[in-house]
């Protein structure tokens, strides 16, 4: 199947949205590196015009260290010619009709040429503004679907979602599709059009009240979180992504749909080289804060499984699934791409590995001194965490407030600063709580069948499209690949 995957990409024209996002970049690099005879890659990215799109592609995609293997293989001049021939950055936006592509000639050309549509575009903020989440994560996929239906040669729409659309349930969480109007708590029926109307009505009220942009933004965030929790989802991100899946399933007609649901995506495992990453994602924020000596206590169940998966494994699963399902009219298949079912790692294990790493390899302050870390305190319930915060911070804060009241001429900046930090910490804990106290295991039966199909057909090239989590040695990966990658590419040290 590996050779079949490479052959599948031969002479294909592929539209990829969500560029220059982390996963989209890795997916694009993979295709260009393994199949130089791909016909064309249309890359949709937000930009004012063609020139801006090209500039953004070069600065935010091609110039990244991710592409160094391709650069070394081709050389600067050949790479430039190769990219000019194969890659077309397109200014656009999935939240509008026809993906915001301007020019009837260009649109017609794309509809005539595109074989595969890959939608990676999303807003991933857990507490995103509800208007933004709905336009990008919910109705964005519907716009991509409508665009894909106009593609004369269209063989497949591959949509990247997230495994956490399954909510906060415990036990084995299956790779099942959503039905239109389904909720996670079953209390009431979800009507997506009603959600859109509620959002628009609230926005209109806020504007009529002459609210500031900051007030509008916060109100939209609060609305998204409240609507999500009303229907059983922990946050706006997974709620709006779930509704996006519902729309795809309901309006797909005969177009083959593949939904890839990754878990927490981490740095590259092996391709194009180990350890490349961009930005702090979920657990990485905790690891970096710990390494900087800022994390003395954290809310987490030590025995909770954190489902991590390297980004190159997700990209490999995407290519393999596309090769398997292209042209299979009417099919809709969900794939969980994660590790909790086949090779789980717990929060306590990650904590211990991070402690071991930073003890042996401490980060260095600007003055050259080493940051010494000690094992932090892990509290497994919100009640324990709130009690700790009260003793450690809130009571001293009340003392500062009392001083401020008694002596109003005293500089109260310290009180305000600590108060702001505590509120921020509690908000972050509330956002991350569903993930660090997670009790579910993501079933990957469909994904395992995909792996077996690939392995049976072409054993000698099995490693080229690796996405088997059993191949990961977590201790080796975390201490020699992932954490060093965070330090190199995120902290830039």
From Swiss-Prot:
The keyword Lipid metabolism applies. Induction: Induced by wounding and salt stress. Belongs to the fatty acyl-CoA reductase family. InterPro entries: FAR, FAR_C, Far_NAD-bd, NAD(P)-bd_dom_sf. Catalyzes the reduction of fatty acyl-CoA to fatty alcohols. Catalyzes specifically the formation of C18:0 and C20:0 fatty alcohols. Provides the fatty alcohols required for synthesis of suberin in roots, seed coat and wound-induced leaf tissue. Provides the fatty alcohols required for synthesis of alkyl hydroxycinnamates in root waxes. It catalyses: a long-chain fatty acyl-CoA + 2 NADPH + 2 H(+) = a long-chain primary fatty alcohol + 2 NADP(+) + CoA. It comes from Arabidopsis thaliana (Mouse-ear cress). The keyword Lipid biosynthesis applies. Transmembrane segments: none annotated. Expressed in the endodermal cell layer surrounding the central vasculature in roots. Expressed in the hilum region of seeds. Expressed in stamen filaments and receptacle of siliques. It comes from the Eukaryota. One of its GO terms (biological process) is lipid metabolic process. SUPFAM superfamilies: NAD(P)-binding Rossmann-fold domains. Coiled coil: none annotated. Its EC number is 1.2.1.84. This is Probable fatty acyl-CoA reductase 4. It holds the Pfam family Sterile. The gene is FAR4. It is an enzyme of class 1 (oxidoreductase). Keywords: Lipid biosynthesis, Lipid metabolism, NADP, Oxidoreductase. GO terms for molecular function: alcohol-forming long-chain fatty acyl-CoA reductase activity; alcohol-forming very long-chain fatty acyl-CoA reductase activity; long-chain-fatty-acyl-CoA reductase activity.
